[in-house]
Amino acid sequence: MRCALSGCVRPGLTAIILCALAASAGHSYAAETQAWDAASSLAASASPPGLRLVWNSGSEDPAAALDRLERAGFPVAVALPPHVYYVRAEGASRSLLPIGFSFQEDGRAETAARQVAVGPPDAPEPRVSAAVGVDLDPFQGRNDAFPPIRLGSSPLRNRIARGGMLQGLPFGARWFDTSEFMIGRVAVSILFPESDGTTDPNRYNWTPALRDSVIRSAVRGLAKWSGFAASHGIALSFAIEVHAGLATRYEPIDRTVAEEDNWIEDVLAGYAGYRSDALTLEYDVANATRSRLGAQWSVLLFAVQNDTDPDGAFPDGYFSHARLGGPFFVTPVNNMNSTSATLDFYIEHEIAHSFWALDEHFPSNGWWSCQLTTGYFNQPNSNSVVPAPGYCGYRRGCLMYANYPDSLCDFTQRQIGWADLDGNGIPDLIETHPAVFPDSSEYRTVAGSPITLRGKALEVAIPNQNPYHYFLGDSISIASIDSVRYRVDGGPANQAVPSDGTFDSGREWFTATLPVLPPGDYVVEWEAWNSNGLKNAESQFTTVSLRAPSAPAGAGGGASASRGLSLRVGPTPSPGPVRFTLRAPPGSRGWGRIHDVRGREVARWRLEVPSSGTADWRWEGRVAGGATLPSGLYFVSIEIDGATLKRRLVISR
């Protein structure tokens, strides 16, 4: 099912997005025209530094176009699908562009762009786009980050309850997780409200030239973030949608921040085609855009026209501002008549708030103290000037500290999810591992027929420690299961088959069919690999025991009958204490070990089976030093007289 405008592309996600977002064919045509006009203007302008513009003359599905380019070896920094894609200049000539794409420099893009009259290519930028200088107070002592939204409305609670964990979202994410960390593809909807004069006098109107200048500023501001990410080995791209002429009864610049829900609700209700409260509409539209563009995250940018406003601010003195954690931010074209900070900078700054970065700038009586923590990893805001410059020992140039659009401090990096807590040079969120769970660790049957084994592979997300989620936020990974492999008795690797036909999500069921084997015992080793290129921390095994058709069945309660071994572990899940019962030949000796999902040993025992043939012991869920282990998945391995027994254990505190 594909709705004309709502982007009903991913079935699980769009089961919740109301098809009222599809609107009419005329609405869809208008949106396509706006995209073409904006793309044509970009094609006639200089590309951001370090990027090359790739033009697509077709109108294919935006997510498919982005995927085609990236599969061909062209990482996209910023895009305005379906026509404009900015790719990194370095290495861009080493691969062949997919069919239908061309570099702007070869003349084809310019020719295509000029088929539509869009005004002069050198249309003036907003007044705030003067040459960049250093202004230590680009917000002139005003707050621009407001507390996170409370998910309290009845319609929104219903959305959340119906949505759950939806197909098409990052693994573990839910409806309201629109910007948890800045890694992957981010959908950015630029919405242009237009007052119709019904309630407030219509004082400002968007012109095509002014609207295009905002889009160019957004491209440049977002390109900064993509460049920062590339320098850290992080894949980050922004896909932009443009929606102009969105009617509202109010003149947005004449309303206070406390009143902005009124005009936002007008704008989004007209766009979506149904009415609801502003908050529900914000998440509905953000999720629809996320689905259309095949993105992991989504942010709404409300551009406000006030180019000739004498004070360049809303009536309460605020100008550009954002809700911490999204799903939207607001940026007037004229921010307090600034002559040093560009509109590019304000967009670059505000989207960081959408991904949980805190301010660091003046005044020193602001709420963004250097002692606060934020973000997926609960990271400190140590570079803040609050309560005084250098109070927490740091004072560094940063785009959250002042007008430093080319500087990103390590504190902000960690707040938006780029933390490298293990110090190996790779951000933790792009080195997550999967886990693999065969349905059985022991399998017995009669030889003479193929054997089908089943199991599940699961991406293991790092726990979300965001304090604004009360440390109970959804644990999310943008990695997915890439493959499951198995080996029989250490032989060559074979590929397991995904039950749904494709390995493309964070949770996958699989089957593996062994050929006809002669009677005997075989060990099947399992490996799961994810899209990070990493495999499970500890391999899992299934012992297959095949007897001749005339041989009697063995006994042992899931253990090898010939060895007389069995292991019981429970309860699992456990709040902490776990009991182990090992049955083995009297006098058997060995070791018991427990590892976490990263392969680190957290517990160890020296084992000797007494004359009763049963060893029984209790573990309190603590490391040797006495520290309590966190909730999570753990792996038990018992090595006894040359045999290995493996079990899985879940601790849930």
What role is predicted for each listed range?
Residues 27-167:
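Autoinhibitory N-terminal propeptides
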Residues 553-596, 606-608, 618-619:
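Glycine-centered coil/turn sites that cap beta-strands in beta-rich domains
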Residues 420, 424, 428:
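Acidic carboxylate motifs that coordinate Ca2+ or other divalent cations, activating on Asp/Glu
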Residues 432-549:
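Long, low-complexity serine/threonine/glycine- and acidic-rich segments characteristic of extracellular
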